[in-house]
Amino acid sequence: MSFDRSRIPTWRQGYRYQYEPAQKGHVLLYPEGMIKLNDSAALIGGLIDGERDVAAIIAELDKQFPGVPELGEDIEQFMEVARAEHWITLA
């Protein structure tokens, strides 16, 4: 089954992406706690705005990091994990 890159990711209600100085990195805050994101996840998370589709997120990161092999597949994998963990919805 292939991933539909035309889908638009949105952070779920109650979840907030932000930079947390105490963690020295980006986190995802939610009612039960916090998830510290690694650098790659933070870059992807910063582009989730409820307006861009996954293809646009891939295109933007490809501009910032040209020639990175399998960039699109890595972003798709992040989206699948984030959806499975109920961090995002995909419209």
Curated annotation (Swiss-Prot):
Query: What InterPro entries is this protein classified in?
Result: PQQD, PqqD_bac, PqqD_sf
Set out the biological process GO terms recorded for this chain's protein.
Answer: pyrroloquinoline quinone biosynthetic process
Gene3D superfamilies hit by this protein = Coenzyme PQQ synthesis protein D (PqqD)
Q: Write one Pfam family the protein is assigned to.
A: PqqD
Q: Which GO terms describe its molecular function?
A: quinone binding
Keyword annotations for this protein? PQQ biosynthesis
Q: Which chain regions cross the lipid bilayer?
A: none
UniProt pathway: Cofactor biosynthesis; pyrroloquinoline quinone biosynthesis
Per the entry, what this protein does is:
Functions as a PqqA binding protein and presents PqqA to PqqE, in the pyrroloquinoline quinone (PQQ) biosynthetic pathway.
Subunit architecture: Monomer. Interacts with PqqE.
Which family, according to the similarity comment?
A: Belongs to the PqqD family.
Q: What is this protein called?
A: PqqA binding protein
Q: Which organism is it from?
A: Pseudomonas fluorescens (strain SBW25)
Classification of source organism:
Bacteria, Pseudomonadati, Pseudomonadota, Gammaproteobacteria, Pseudomonadales
